[in-house]
Amino acid sequence: ADSTRLSLAVTLFFVGCGVGNFFAGPLADALGRKPVVVGSMALYGAAAIASALSPSLTVLFISRFVWGFAAAGPRTLSQAMVRDRYSGEAMARVMTLMQTIFFLAPIVAPLIGKGFLELGGWRWTMGFGVIPAVIIAVWVLTIEETLDVENKRSLELGRVFEGFKIVAKNRVTFGYGLAVTFGFGAFYSFLGSTELVLEDIYDYGDQFFLFFSMMSVFLGLAAFVANRVLQRMSAKRLAFLAGVGLVVSSVGMVIAAVAHNGKPPFLLW
């Protein structure tokens, strides 16, 4: 029960990240990319400090939600900044390159976290979040704003909903958006429960950092391969093939889980 409650700290981070996406985009369209990223990093660092100093689980859960909310800023706006400068297949290649970097970071993160746990406990691990927040904020301040003045949009609520309506009415955009939503929903659910499953189901809790790093290697490798494939294949076809692969693998995992009473073989999982 305690491990389940503690896993909420991870889950709430991703929930906050999902909620933050609805605010980061409209704010960046009105104010520009740089101010929103820098502001997000300031909130990110403050939430990291609050998490490190939290006197109770309630405070920890709240600060983790805020932390995730702030993390949505650079995550969302990095893609927006690419769209400001690229389009078509070139944009897809840059996006997959970004995904490679995004997935490579978690390879070293568990190792750093384990090191801080050995040195000073979980509070040190939480407090470490201040360092990347400062680095990203300083770096963003040194680059040019990518959103042209003529492309800025009003922050009026009606204009914001108008933008959502335009996206919803575009069948292609809405379809891909829905697919990405379900895909990332499953992925974030997996991330939020991985440590709990390794510890309570497979008794590998002490080796979580190792398995997580291995998983990140394959994710980064997949993104790198996708970047190369996009030089010879259209983004639409690659997305279709990836979607088919996800459906087939997901169905296979469900069958394996049912066949083994909810506990599929570890190597398959």
Give the location of each predicted region.
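Helix-loop-helix hairpin linking two adjacent transmembrane segments in secondary transporters
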Residues: 59, 88-89, 96-141
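Extracellular/periplasmic helix-loop-helix junction of adjacent transmembrane segments
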Residues: 1-18
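Conserved MFS/SLC helix-loop-helix module at the cytosolic interface between two early adjacent transmembrane helices
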Residues: 18-58
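Structural signature of the two symmetry-related core transmembrane helices
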Residues: 35-49, 130, 238-253
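Cytoplasmic helix-loop-helix junction between adjacent transmembrane helices
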Residues: 63-102
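Residue-level signature of mid-helix packing/kink "hotspots" within the transmembrane helices
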Residues: 14-22, 106-107, 216-224
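Juxtamembrane intracellular "pre-TM" segments in multi-pass secondary transporters
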Residues: 146-176
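Helix-to-loop junctions at the C-terminal end of transmembrane segments
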Residues: 21-31, 222-236
